[in-house]
């Protein structure tokens, strides 16, 4: 059935007031959306982060009286509404619409990330089957893409790979499919470890080839290749630990870094690594190098 959709342009300070008001006047769903494609990083503990410019979308039953709705919202919110737009939208197959947003993606020369509902575009290529899920990492974000492209360009034969902050396991699984005999994953989120196991199983990876650990349980065995796609702050603060996990002569790739954060991260690793030129994609960077 069709719906009445109300879109409000709000600030984070207005979010709770308008969310409560929309629910009080009968909204069946309320959604916050980024109005300007702004990333959110490392929010303070106990906070719910919102973008500085946020769209609040609310859906109402199709027979809702639009004029009365807006008047009631104005009354509840104490006067003038912020910039807003009201439209009627047709119902659709929301699951199919969501699935259509995720298409097979190629990284480098050999590697494809393929959702399970799609046929592989190149059956003879290296195809990693992965669906969007609760853990971070599907290949759509520039930082994941930078790491996947880097892995595709490496000779991983005989290498043990460590995925530091493994999320969905996408980087470790890609490394295994690209020729690494073993990969290890670690993440602070137990749900991420479960997602990594599930995704490895979907790709036919023997669990013995891809053990995953919480950080406290991670064996302190240096690896030939380490990838860490997390955030700039942790990459800097954890530089001694990450450096120790790369064996001498081993290779390191770091991402989750904005371009303006690159120099700080490079400085944290320059003492132990011969660093490559910084790779940039859509305002994000990858820093890689070889341990001396």
UniProtKB/Swiss-Prot annotation:
<feature type="binding site">
    <location>
        <position position="229"/>
    </location>
    <ligand>
        <name>S-adenosyl-L-methionine</name>
    </ligand>
</feature>
<comment type="function">
    <text>Methylates ribosomal protein L11.</text>
</comment>
<feature type="binding site">
    <location>
        <position position="187"/>
    </location>
    <ligand>
        <name>S-adenosyl-L-methionine</name>
    </ligand>
</feature>
<dbReference type="Pfam" id="PF06325">
    <property type="entry name" value="PrmA"/>
</dbReference>
<dbReference type="GO" id="GO:0005829">
    <property type="term" value="C:cytosol"/>
</dbReference>
<keyword id="KW-0949">S-adenosyl-L-methionine</keyword>
<dbReference type="GO" id="GO:0016279">
    <property type="term" value="F:protein-lysine N-methyltransferase activity"/>
</dbReference>
<feature type="binding site">
    <location>
        <position position="165"/>
    </location>
    <ligand>
        <name>S-adenosyl-L-methionine</name>
    </ligand>
</feature>
<dbReference type="InterPro" id="IPR029063">
    <property type="entry name" value="SAM-dependent_MTases_sf"/>
</dbReference>
<keyword id="KW-0963">Cytoplasm</keyword>
<dbReference type="InterPro" id="IPR050078">
    <property type="entry name" value="Ribosomal_L11_MeTrfase_PrmA"/>
</dbReference>
<dbReference type="InterPro" id="IPR004498">
    <property type="entry name" value="Ribosomal_PrmA_MeTrfase"/>
</dbReference>
<keyword id="KW-0489">Methyltransferase</keyword>
<dbReference type="GO" id="GO:0032259">
    <property type="term" value="P:methylation"/>
</dbReference>
<protein>
    <recommendedName>
        <fullName>Ribosomal protein L11 methyltransferase</fullName>
        <ecNumber>2.1.1.-</ecNumber>
    </recommendedName>
</protein>
<keyword id="KW-0808">Transferase</keyword>
<comment type="similarity">
    <text>Belongs to the methyltransferase superfamily. PrmA family.</text>
</comment>
<feature type="binding site">
    <location>
        <position position="144"/>
    </location>
    <ligand>
        <name>S-adenosyl-L-methionine</name>
    </ligand>
</feature>
């Amino acid at each position: 059935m069709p719906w009445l959709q109300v879109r409000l342009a709000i600030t984070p300070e207005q979010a709770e007031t308008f969310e409560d008001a929309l629910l009080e006047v009968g909204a069946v769903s309320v959604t916050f959306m980024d109005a300007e494609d702004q990333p959110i990083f490392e929010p303070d503990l106990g906070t719910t982060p919102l973008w500085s410019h946020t769209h609040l979308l609310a859906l109402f039953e199709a027979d809702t009286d639009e004029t009365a709705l807006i008047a009631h919202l104005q009354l509840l919110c104490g006067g003038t509404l912020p910039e807003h737009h009201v439209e009627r939208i047709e119902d659709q197959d929301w699951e199919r619409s969501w699935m259509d947003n995720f298409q097979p993606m190629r990284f480098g020369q050999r590697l494809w990330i393929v959702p399970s509902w799609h046929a592989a575009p190149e059956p003879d290529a290296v195809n990693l089957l992965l669906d969007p899920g609760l853990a971070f990492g599907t290949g759509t974000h520039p930082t994941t893409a930078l790491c996947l492209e880097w892995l595709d360009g490496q000779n991983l034969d005989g290498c043990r790979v460590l995925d530091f902050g493994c999320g969905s396991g996408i980087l470790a699984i890609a490394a295994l499919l690209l020729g690494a005999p073993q990969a290890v994953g670690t993440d602070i989120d137990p749900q991420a470890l479960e997602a990594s196991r599930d995704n490895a199983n979907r790709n036919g990876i023997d669990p013995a080839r891809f053990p995953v650990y919480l950080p406290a349980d991670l064996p302190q065995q240096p690896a030939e290749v380490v990838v860490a796609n997390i955030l700039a702050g942790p990459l800097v603060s954890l530089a001694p630990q990450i450096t120790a996990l790369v064996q001498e002569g081993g290779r390191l790739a770091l991402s989750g870094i904005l371009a303006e954060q690159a120099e700080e991260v490079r400085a944290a690793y320059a003492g132990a690594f011969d660093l490559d030129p910084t790779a940039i994609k859509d305002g994000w960077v990858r820093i890689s190098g070889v341990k001396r």
